[in-house]
C-alpha cells in the first residue's frame, strides 16, 4: 500500500463505533482535505452535550431516535427537535448546521441515537439551522441509462441553494447493489470526504481515488484531494450508502463537478 493510499483510505473503524464521541479526523490531521469527522453514539435513554464548536459544523442523524436541542450560544437554547431515523437506505436525514460558538444537547430515545459531526474551518452563518428530511433534495441519477448500471439516489442536504455562506456542501448517496455512483468519474477543486455503510455486515464495494482503487467496507472513509478523479461501485448483492462532505474553498464554492473528459459521453448515453 502506498503512502497516498494510506492517507486517502481510512479503515480503523470497521468494527463500528462505541458509545460516546469518537474522533476519526480533526482539522489538520490530513494535509489535503481539512475536514474533521466525529461520530457521536448514544445508548438508549441517555444524554450527551456537544460543547460550543470552534469551527462551523454539520451534524447528520444516522440512526435512532430522540431530541436535539440547538444552543446558539452558552445559556441559550432553541426548542428541541424530535428526530428519528430507522433506515439509512430509505429515509433522508435530519441535519443541523452549527456556526462557530454554537453547541447541541442530545437526548436519545428508546432506540439510541447516532450522529456524524463534520467540521470545516471558519465561522459559518450567524445562526444554527435545522434541515428536516422533507427539505432534503432527492434525485434519481443515471436512471434509464446503460441498463441502469449507474442509477443511484443522490440526496443533497446543504448546498448553495439552501446553505449559502457555509463552508461545506454535503449529502448522501444510495448506491444500488452491483451498480456505480459518483459516475461518470469526476473531480472538482474542493476536497471531499466519504463515509460508508452497507445493507449487510459483509457488504463491500470499490472506490476509485485518482489512479488508486481500494476495497471499502462499512465505516471506512475515503478522502479526495483537490482535483482528484473519483467514482464508486458496490459489489453485486450489497447496497452501499455513503455520506459525502465537500469543503468549499474561500474563493470557490462547490456548484457542479467537472466530468473526466474521456468519459463525458456517458452523460447522454442511453
Regions found by a protein language model. Give the residues of each.
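Double-stranded beta-helix
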Residues: 87, 111-153, 208, 243-270
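Extended, compositionally biased flexible segments
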Residues: 29, 37-108
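Glycine- and acidic-residue-biased ligand/ion/polar-headgroup-sensing regions
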Residues: 53-78, 177-178, 183, 189-221, ...
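A short glycine-rich, His/Asp/Glu-containing loop-to-beta-strand
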Residues: 15-49, 56, 145-192
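Non-transmembrane, aqueous-exposed alpha-helical and coiled segments at domain scale
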Residues: 2, 10, 14-18
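Conserved hydrophobic/aromatic beta-strand scaffold that supports enzyme active sites
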Residues: 37-41, 58, 95-97, 117, ...
Amino acid at each position: 500500500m502506498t503512502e497516498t493510499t494510506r492517507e486517502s483510505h481510512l479503515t480503523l473503524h470497521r468494527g463500528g463505533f462505541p458509545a460516546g464521541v469518537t474522533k476519526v479526523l480533526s482539522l489538520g490531521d490530513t494535509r489535503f482535505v481539512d475536514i474533521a469527522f466525529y461520530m457521536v453514539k448514544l445508548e438508549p435513554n441517555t444524554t450527551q452535550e456537544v460543547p460550543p464548536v470552534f469551527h462551523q459544523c454539520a451534524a447528520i442523524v444516522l440512526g435512532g431516535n430522540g431530541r436535539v436541542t440547538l444552543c446558539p450560544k452558552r445559556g441559550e437554547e432553541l426548542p428541541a427537535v424530535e428526530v428519528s431515523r430507522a433506515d439509512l437506505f430509505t429515509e433522508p436525514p435530519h441535519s443541523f448546521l452549527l456556526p462557530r460558538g454554537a453547541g447541541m444537547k442530545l437526548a436519545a430515545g428508546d432506540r439510541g441515537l447516532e450522529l456524524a459531526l463534520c467540521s470545516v474551518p471558519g465561522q459559518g452563518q450567524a445562526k444554527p439551522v435545522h434541515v428536516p428530511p422533507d427539505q432534503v433534495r432527492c434525485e434519481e441519477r443515471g436512471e434509464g441509462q446503460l441498463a441502469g448500471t449507474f442509477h443511484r439516489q443522490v440526496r443533497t442536504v446543504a448546498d448553495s441553494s439552501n446553505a449559502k455562506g457555509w463552508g461545506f456542501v454535503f449529502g448522501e448517496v444510495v448506491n444500488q447493489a452491483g451498480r456505480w455512483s459518483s459516475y461518470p468519474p469526476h473531480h472538482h477543486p474542493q476536497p471531499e470526504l466519504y463515509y460508508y455503510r452497507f445493507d449487510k455486515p459483509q457488504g463491500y464495494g470499490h472506490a476509485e481515488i485518482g489512479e488508486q482503487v481500494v476495497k471499502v467496507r462499512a465505516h471506512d472513509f475515503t478522502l479526495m484531494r483537490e482535483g482528484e478523479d473519483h467514482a464508486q461501485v458496490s459489489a453485486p448483492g450489497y447496497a452501499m450508502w455513503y455520506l459525502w462532505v465537500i469543503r468549499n474553498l474561500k474563493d470557490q464554492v462547490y456548484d457542479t463537478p467537472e466530468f473526466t473528459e474521456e468519459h463525458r459521453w456517458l452523460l447522454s448515453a442511453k
